[in-house]
Regions:
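A structural micro-motif
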Residues: 1, 29, 70, 93, ...
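Short flexible coil/turn linkers enriched for glycine and charged/polar residues
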Residues: 142-145, 155-156, 254, 264, ...
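Hydrophobic, well-ordered secondary-structure elements that form the walls
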Residues: 260, 301, 321, 329, ...
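Conserved SAM/AdoMet-binding glycine-rich loop
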Residues: 72-73, 81-82, 86, 188-311
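Terminal RNA-binding accessory module
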Residues: 344-435
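Short glycine-enriched, charge-decorated loop/helix-capping segments at active-site entrances
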Residues: 47-48, 168-169, 208-211, 272-277, ...
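Contiguous mid-protein beta-loop-alpha structural module that forms a pocket-lining wall or clamp
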Residues: 309, 325-326
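Proteins enriched for Cys/Gly/acidic motifs involved in redox and nucleic-acid/cofactor modification
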Residues: 1-204, 219, 243, 258, ...
Length: 435
């Protein structure tokens, strides 16, 4: 039987999809990416923005149209939050929540076409107190060189704009022992790089007994003497301190790259969002990192058009990014999420103004990326070869630059490369054979 799995959204979603694919393959199912040839199509949905909702619905409708005979399954965060709305789409057979997602391996033999969607959703995920375990994936199943490892799920922050705690539940963590076991499994699979991911990494370990911090977990991983690169996914500025930054100095395996969920450069907007840090805290982190490590990659998330965001508030964000040595930005247009505090706020920013501000920030993002690439020209970096693209080998450096080479290389090898010139979305390089 052929199963196609499609993923929308974050690295946690991707990790869970990869895990399911590996479990299915071990049970004898074939994992494909062709809708027309699939017997079962699973969409792991996202609901972080209005656009993610739309993309989830569009993909489900596309599957139903292209292959009406296939069993269509919607799971993930949008399925968790909007199961009643999804149930109105004719052709969806099953709507499965985040808690129930892990049970898909047991449900598969019993799935069949339905006249009406069957809904399997825990109605109140905020009551979940244990981590739903998804085992790490096999490299021959996902055919990727970079492995994700979900070590944490859920969030207790309840920021005013964010629906994620309602879709993912409260913060829960994988035990340090399980984390270490999974890391060795992935290393033995042949992965050369591991990305720690979670809904709120900084909350890792607070729910465990005894509690353990994310920093303490990283130190424990460091002591294992692993032979693979470690990369971190998004971090909250409030959880990055001196000891955390110091770890990058003492651990060569830890990639010099952080993605910081800033969201706004306006103190007023940060307070309305319920974010637990100041602009000065963000500045302190960025300047300290760049002082210690001049080629450190720093990415930021920005939400544009939060209710009440004035032109002055926006310019505070724009000028902060312009002045700080930020490497790149991920820019999101604000959209109301049902049930959140900000959805009830007045002073909504008109869509045309949001679009104008997004356009300005995206141009600034292009400038920031170009400047970061320029600073790295002539350097030698360690590139993990990930794929072949139009005759080029493509991979990422330790500081997250997309690097292209014409020379023949093997996928899943780390190669020393000299960066030469701008190229596509990254930099053109040549293998460095000197000392």
């Amino acid at each position: 039987m052929n199963i196609a799995i499609f993923t929308i959204g974050c690295k946690v979603n991707q990790y869970e999809s990869d895990s399911l694919a590996s479990l299915f393959k071990k049970k004898g199912y074939s994992i494909i990416d062709n809708i027309e040839k699939a017997h079962i199509c699973i969409v792991n949905t996202c609901t972080v923005t209005h656009r993610a909702d739309y993309d989830s619905r569009r993909l489900l409708r596309q599957i139903i149209k292209k292959n009406p005979q296939a069993i269509c399954v919607a799971t993930g965060c949008y399925a968790q939050i909007a199961y009643k709305k999804l149930a109105q789409i004719k052709g969806i057979d099953y709507i499965i929540g985040n808690k129930e997602k892990a049970e898909l391996i047991k449900l598969l033999p019993y799935l069949k076409k339905q006249s009406f969607p069957q809904i399997l959703v825990e109605k109140n995920p905020t009551t979940l107190d244990t981590l739903v375990c998804f085992p790490p994936s096999d490299r021959d199943t996902i055919k990727r060189t970079r492995a994700y490892l979900k070590i944490q799920d859920g969030c207790d922050a309840f920021c005013s704009y964010c629906i994620v705690p309602y879709a993912r539940g409260r913060a829960r963590s994988l035990s340090p022992e399980e984390v270490i076991k999974h890391i060795y499994y992935l290393q033995n699979q042949g992965f050369k790089e591991l990305v720690f991911c979670g809904i709120h990494l900084g909350e890792y370990g607070k729910d465990l007994f005894p509690p353990i911090s994310f920093l303490s977990l990283l130190k424990l991983v460091k002591d294992q003497g692993l032979d693979l690169r470690i990369r971190l996914s998004s971090m909250n500025p409030a959880e990055i301190n001196y000891q955390f930054i110091e770890l990058f100095e003492n651990w060569p395996n830890l990639c010099p790259h952080l993605h910081i969920s800033l969201q706004s450069g306006s103190e007023n907007i940060l307070q309305k969002m319920g974010r637990p840090y100041t602009v000065d805290k963000f500045k302190e982190i960025v300047l300290d990192l760049k002082y210690r490590f001049p080629y450190f990659a720093i990415g930021v998330d920005i939400i544009v058009g939060f209710p009440g965001e004035t032109e002055r508030n926006f310019l505070q964000t724009y000028n902060l990014i312009k002045e700080m040595p930020v490497s790149y930005c991920h820019i999101f247009s604000y959209s109301d999420r049902p049930g959140t505090k900000s959805a009830k706020m007045k002073e909504k920013v008109p869509l045309e103004i949001i679009k104008k501000r997004v356009k300005a920030l995206r141009q600034l993002d292009k400038n920031k990326r170009a400047q970061f690439f320029k600073e790295n020209m002539g350097r030698t970096v360690q590139v993990l070869i990930e794929q072949k693209v139009d005759g080029f080998s493509k991979g990422h450096s330790e500081n997250y630059i997309s690097v292209y080479m014409e020379e023949k290389t093997e996928i899943n090898q780390i190669i020393t490369v000299k960066l030469i010139d701008y190229f596509h979305d990254g930099v053109y390089g040549k293998i460095h054979r000197g000392k």
